[in-house]
């Protein structure tokens, strides 16, 4: 319907333009202006056939059809001469009353017409609605929450307790500024929240406003700069004027890197000067208001490294707070928050879900429970069970199941052997990521998956950890070669080889884990004109060759080790593959049970230590120790 309406509007506009063009072009007479002397000469030579006099202008037509225009001076006898020579002379009727108004209107009509088209296009670009909106270029597009203040509080923010403590003094200042002013202190003018996408930067800003019970003014960094020059700076001024009217309040600028990118001599991308003007105005405004005005600026970004240093100096964004991804305890608390409005069955173990989601942010966890709720609703269930949560987790981490994909029995066997090789390495090595389940059901881009879950969150890795990870990655390829020979290896190990090589390269060139190369790191720089591609600098060809040799040595050693392990456990591995082909998905416990039939014990390889139980035990031990100390004191 809207498309048809727009078609008719444009058809009318184009039609009106054609009519106006024909109207004005039709009224024009194409004549050549000449001097009075030339006309007199033509009259005397008898070359003029017709003349039309319009006030002080005469249109002369020669016998050869040429039209000439001449301006007649007062009291001229040119008309009498033309009559004497037999020229037909006509005098146009005098202009009717109001004719000059018509002429003025007709002369201005094209200009008014195109102004109307321009206004129409501006209204279309601004989304219609208010007629004046198209001209409010300099007005800020910030959303102001005054009566409807953010309902989010610190109860809705979990997993970042240290960050919450850090921002509580901002809330106290907004509630009672006199308390700080008595001691001569001032709160930070600006707070920069930075971290990976989804960690809760925007949610935390809303919670601060909700706890302080003050107006919340929200704007995106991309709302400042548009197609018109000077609009960004004007919108920054209007934003702070709006904030002063509603003080005390919080200004929240999301994705500030869109406008706060570091200034430089080399413009990268278009609109460079306009963006710098907007940034300069933002710097001036943040210097121009005093903390006694009751305005706190909170900004969020995923890229603090590209922000202008002038924006980050004390006096503007005094406090910079990093919001990390939640650890296992934080994920558990976040899951509890998002589970408040969900109907969970009794079998749902949020502690297990927290342990099974390393690297997940708050947004990821919310999406996980939402996906589980949708799956439960699709199945017609009244509650969300652990089955739906695990299925949702598999969909997010590994992709959708492609059960309808046709795979030949021979290919299926190779996939099963490949995945069994991965699982075997994970079980016999000292890798901290324990095997959870093995599946040969195609998911996403993968034809099979071996899922591993970490026992605990790790922040640093030693050389042994990295060797074990490379061993697990090469386990699938090693199993293929042992079972089918060198000519039977497949393309299924492409991603495994890439990840293993990248890990080995980092060990040698970044983390100094090679005895031959030594504890050095290759300096690398990114070129902004090549899409951020990094290149090594100040590195000799000999050193690069040594690095390549060490990477190859690490990969080769771990690959040979993986093949030896597969050879050692070849018979029980065949039985595992057979079971995997029958069931398509098996758990770690089922894998271990098959090995037990061959007299091989993989003790505690599937046991996942309960971090939460460890935490509880440590808390109990602390309480016991404190009670013992009290008794000793008494």
From Swiss-Prot:
SUPFAM superfamilies reported in the protein's UniProt record: FtsH protease domain-like, P-loop containing nucleoside triphosphate hydrolases
Q: Which family does it belong to?
A: In the central section; belongs to the AAA ATPase family.
What spans does the record annotate as topological domain Periplasmic, numbered to this chain?
27-100
The record lists the membrane-crossing segments as 6-26, 101-121
What NCBIfam families does the annotation carry?
A: FtsH_fam
- Which Pfam families does UniProt cross-reference here? AAA, AAA_lid_3, FtsH_ext, Peptidase_M41
GO cellular component terms given for this protein: plasma membrane
How does it sit in the bilayer? Multi-pass membrane protein
| EC assignment | 3.4.24.-
**Subunit field text:** The isolated protease domain (residues 405-634) forms a stable hexamer.
The record's subcellular locations are: Cell inner membrane
The lineage is:
Bacteria, Pseudomonadati, Aquificota, Aquificia, Aquificales
GO biological process entries: protein catabolic process; proteolysis
- HAMAP family xrefs: FtsH (MF_01458)
Species source reads: Aquifex aeolicus (strain VF5)
- Name-wise, this protein is ATP-dependent zinc metalloprotease FtsH
């Amino acid at each position: 319907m809207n498309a048809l309406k727009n078609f008719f509007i444009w058809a009318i506009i184009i039609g009106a333009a054609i009519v106006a063009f024909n109207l004005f072009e039709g009224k024009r007479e194409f004549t050549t202006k000449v001097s009075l002397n030339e006309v007199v000469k033509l009259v005397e030579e008898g070359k003029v056939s017709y003349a039309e006099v319009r006030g002080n202008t005469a249109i002369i037509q020669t016998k050869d059809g040429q039209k000439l225009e001449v301006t007649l001076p007062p009291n001229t006898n040119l008309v009498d001469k033309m009559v004497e020579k037999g020229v037909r002379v006509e005098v146009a009727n005098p202009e009717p009353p109001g004719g000059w108004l018509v002429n003025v209107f007709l002369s201005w009509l094209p200009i008014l017409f195109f102004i109307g088209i321009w206004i129409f296009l501006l209204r279309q670009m601004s989304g219609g609605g208010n007629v004046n909106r198209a001209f409010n270029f300099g007005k800020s597009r910030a959303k102001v929450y005054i009566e409807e203040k953010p309902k989010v509080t610190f109860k809705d923010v979990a997993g970042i307790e240290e960050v919450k403590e850090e921002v509580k003094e901002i809330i106290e200042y907004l509630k009672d500024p006199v308390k700080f002013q008595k001691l001569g202190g001032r709160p930070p003018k600006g707070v920069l929240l930075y971290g990976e996408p989804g960690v809760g930067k925007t949610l935390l800003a809303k919670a601060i406003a909700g706890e302080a019970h003050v107006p919340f003014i929200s704007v995106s960094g991309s709302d400042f700069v548009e197609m018109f020059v000077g609009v960004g700076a004007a919108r920054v001024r209007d934003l702070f004027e709006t904030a002063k009217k509603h003080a005390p309040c919080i200004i929240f600028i999301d994705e500030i890197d869109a406008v706060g990118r570091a200034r430089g001599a080399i413009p990268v991308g278009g609109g460079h000067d306009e963006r710098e003007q907007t940034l300069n105005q933002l710097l001036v405004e943040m210097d121009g208001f005093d903390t006694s005005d009751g305005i706190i600026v909170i900004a969020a970004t995923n890229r603090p490294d590209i922000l202008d240093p002038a924006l980050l100096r004390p006096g503007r964004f005094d406090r910079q707070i990093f919001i990390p991804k939640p650890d296992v305890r934080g994920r558990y608390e976040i899951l509890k928050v998002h589970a408040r409005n969900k109907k969970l069955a009794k079998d749902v173990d949020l502690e297990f879900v927290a342990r099974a989601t390393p690297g997940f942010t708050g947004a990821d966890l919310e999406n996980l429970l939402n996906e589980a709720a949708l799956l439960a609703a699709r199945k017609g269930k009244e509650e969300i069970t652990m089955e739906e949560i695990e299925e949702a987790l598999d969909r997010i981490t590994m992709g959708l199941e492609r059960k309808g994909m046709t795979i030949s029995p021979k290919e299926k066997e190779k996939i099963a052997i490949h995945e069994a090789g991965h699982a075997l390495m994970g079980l016999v090595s000292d890798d901290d990521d324990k095997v959870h389940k093995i599946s040969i059901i195609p998911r996403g881009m993968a034809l099979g998956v071996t899922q591993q879950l970490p026992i605990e969150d790790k922040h640093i890795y030693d050389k042994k950890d990295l060797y074990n990870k490379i061993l697990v990655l090469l386990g699938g390829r090693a199993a293929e070669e042992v079972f089918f020979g060198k000519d039977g290896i497949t393309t299924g190990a492409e991603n495994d080889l890439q990840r293993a090589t990248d890990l080995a390269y980092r060990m040698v060139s970044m983390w100094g884990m090679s005895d031959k190369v030594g504890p050095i790191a290759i300096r690398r720089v990114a070129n902004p004109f090549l899409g951020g591609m990094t290149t090594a600098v100040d590195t000799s060809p000999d050193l690069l060759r040594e690095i390549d040799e060490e990477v190859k040595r690490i990969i080769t050693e771990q690959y040979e080790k993986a093949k030896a392990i597969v050879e050692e456990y070849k018979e029980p591995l065949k039985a595992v593959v057979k079971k995997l082909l029958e069931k398509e998905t098996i758990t770690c416990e089922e894998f271990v049970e098959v090995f037990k039939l061959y007299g091989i014990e993989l003790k505690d390889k599937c046991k996942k230590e309960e971090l939460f139980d460890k935490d509880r035990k440590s808390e109990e031990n602390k309480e016991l120790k404190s009670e013992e100390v009290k008794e000793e004191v008494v």
